[in-house]
């Protein structure tokens, strides 16, 4: 799989789950994002499908009994998203910058960027352990996102006739994130 396709693949997975269960892409993406903290991608998808399936068949109360590999609070958010009428409510429920950005990347918001400790290290230009990554407050988060957006713009301008012509900020983040983890042997 092309690294650049990471979020497009996530979008297709969310669309497939949405179609199978008669919900919107945004709702499926919201559930996936809600269940993502400390959850491997493959398990995240299994958990999202299970919650959505049980919710569709038996409702919120039964969906609360589904086992997931993330925090109980995040399962609560996933169910709230299933009960939520609009995309704006989904973002309010998700609440955090990183998890909301992950949701936006899945649904294809071009300038959304999911900033975690690895993305910070890439931006900072030095490998830091996660315990040495500072708290990424609102202002710093916005600065890092702005720099990823600018990097995408520079690459689009430089590569207007090649494969970078339509590069998004979230693709720059995904490419650098996966490459960084591979170069540094980071598996978790």
Can you name each region flagged by the protein language model?
Residues 4-188:
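HhH-family (HhH-GPD) DNA N-glycosylase catalytic core used in base-excision repair
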């Amino acid at each position: 799989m092309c690294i650049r396709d990471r979020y497009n693949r996530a979008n297709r997975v969310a669309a497939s789950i949405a179609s199978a269960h008669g919900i919107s892409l945004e709702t499926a993406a919201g559930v996936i994002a809600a269940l993502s903290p400390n959850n491997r991608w493959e398990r995240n998808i299994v958990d999202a499908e299970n919650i959505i399936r049980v919710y569709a068949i038996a409702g919120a109360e039964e969906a609360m009994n589904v086992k997931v590999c993330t925090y109980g609070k995040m399962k609560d958010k996933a169910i709230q998203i299933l009960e939520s009428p609009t995309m704006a409510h989904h973002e309010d429920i998700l609440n955090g910058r990183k998890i909301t950005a992950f949701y936006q990347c899945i649904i294809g918001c071009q300038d959304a960027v999911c900033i975690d400790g690895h993305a910070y290290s890439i931006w900072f230009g030095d490998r830091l352990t996660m315990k040495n990554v500072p708290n990424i407050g609102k202002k710093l988060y916005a600065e890092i996102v702005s720099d990823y957006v600018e990097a995408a713009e520079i690459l689009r301008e430089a590569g207007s006739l090649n494969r970078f012509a339509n590069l998004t900020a979230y693709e720059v983040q995904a490419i650098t994130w996966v490459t960084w983890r591979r170069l540094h042997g980071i598996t978790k």
